[in-house]
């Protein structure tokens, strides 16, 4: 009887251990309304217009929020990052050319890439994208896209940023990459907050 109880106890402990290992292997997911992604194209191409990114705080949080902005080239390397305050019901407008890609880490202007925005609580000075980012839902964003030239014109389209699920690992990676960009760039790699709000 004692041996049967010991065997059952070992089986229960093994199953619990497997459950803990399995649970820890799952990525920790954060609120689904905190992470927005979109792309830009034909940036800085001669004759092409400038694209814009617009971010609004709908006011549902009853306070200021940070738009933590991370700009990547088409080779998946972070080129610029910045944190920008957004007040309730405020609208912030970024020029892709002047605000998001004019100060690249390596000195080469990115023609095509993507923009990731984390909606976050105000942290430091007032918005620091490289550390202590606490995702907080609500920001909305739209971006214009400069399409490939048709005849003599570059067609422009606009889309809402897509909501994506932000994992704790992705948030940690964004902050670490931005920290690296800020420290290595000696002033390069820091985007600017555009106009408005």
Residue ranges with predicted function:
Residues 2-3, 17-18, 22:
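C-terminal cell-surface anchoring/sorting signal
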Residues 9-19:
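Bacterial N-terminal signal peptides
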Residues 22-197:
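Gly/Pro-rich, tryptophan- and cysteine-flecked surface segments typical
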Residues 1-10:
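Bacterial N-terminal signal peptides that target proteins for export
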């Amino acid at each position: 009887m004692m041996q049967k109880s010991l065997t059952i106890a070992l089986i229960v402990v093994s199953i619990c251990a497997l459950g803990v290992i399995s649970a820890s292997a799952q990525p920790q997911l954060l609120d689904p309304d905190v992470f927005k992604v979109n792309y830009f194209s034909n940036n800085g191409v001669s004759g092409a217009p400038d694209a814009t990114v617009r971010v609004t705080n709908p006011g549902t949080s009853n306070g200021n929020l940070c738009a933590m902005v991370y700009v990547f080239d088409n080779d998946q390397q972070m080129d610029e990052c910045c944190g920008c305050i957004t007040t309730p019901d405020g609208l912030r407008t970024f020029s892709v050319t002047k605000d998001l890609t004019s100060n690249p880490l390596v000195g080469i202007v990115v023609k095509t890439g993507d923009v990731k925005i984390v909606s976050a609580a105000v942290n430091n000075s007032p918005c620091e994208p490289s550390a202590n980012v606490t995702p907080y839902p609500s920001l909305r964003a739209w971006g214009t896209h400069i399409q490939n030239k048709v005849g003599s014109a570059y067609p422009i389209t606009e889309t809402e940023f897509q909501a994506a699920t932000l994992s704790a690992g992705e948030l940690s990676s964004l902050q670490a990459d931005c920290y690296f960009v800020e420290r290595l760039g000696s002033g390069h790699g820091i985007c600017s907050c555009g106009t408005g709000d």
